[in-house]
């Protein structure tokens, strides 16, 4: 059975445009990589693909493909030594995602959600929550 047939039979497919779902997953992946680079840059003198692979538990080859895509989009710079730095736009995206993650996870923990579940849920929420909703939550809890 073709993948498109299987997907079309899924109930969620009728509610979402399949290509939008694919694009959303690509954006989420890119945002996770940018956030990871930001976090690693706070504790390491330089960030390399191998550092990202170790942090995320991914194969170095997968990280290399992602770094190529982020570089092509202008979110990172990779120098001749393989050191990765965020561009201004890459840093802005990473800081936005990081702020969302930190605020949402701490909020969920204060609501009584276990730390593990709060961290996992915040990681999902940080990519899909609207600016309006995030700002409202931020205003309410700060």
Label each PLM-derived region with a short phrase.
Residues 3-16, 44, 120-142:
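C-terminal regulatory/oligomerization modules of transcriptional regulators
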């Amino acid at each position: 059975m073709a993948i498109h047939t299987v997907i079309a039979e899924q109930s969620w497919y009728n509610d979402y445009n399949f290509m939008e779902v694919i694009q959303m997953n690509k954006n989420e992946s890119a945002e996770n990589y940018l956030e990871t680079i930001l976090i690693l840059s706070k504790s390491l003198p330089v960030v390399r693909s191998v550092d990202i692979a170790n942090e995320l538990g991914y194969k170095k080859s997968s990280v290399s493909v992602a770094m190529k895509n982020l570089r092509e989009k202008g979110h990172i710079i990779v120098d001749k030594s393989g050191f990765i730095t965020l561009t201004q736009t890459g840093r802005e995206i990473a800081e936005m995602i990081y702020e969302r993650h930190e605020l949402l996870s701490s909020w969920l923990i204060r609501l009584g959600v276990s730390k593990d579940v709060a961290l996992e849920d915040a990681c999902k929420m940080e990519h899909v929550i609207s600016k309006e909703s995030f700002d409202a939550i931020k205003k309410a809890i700060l």
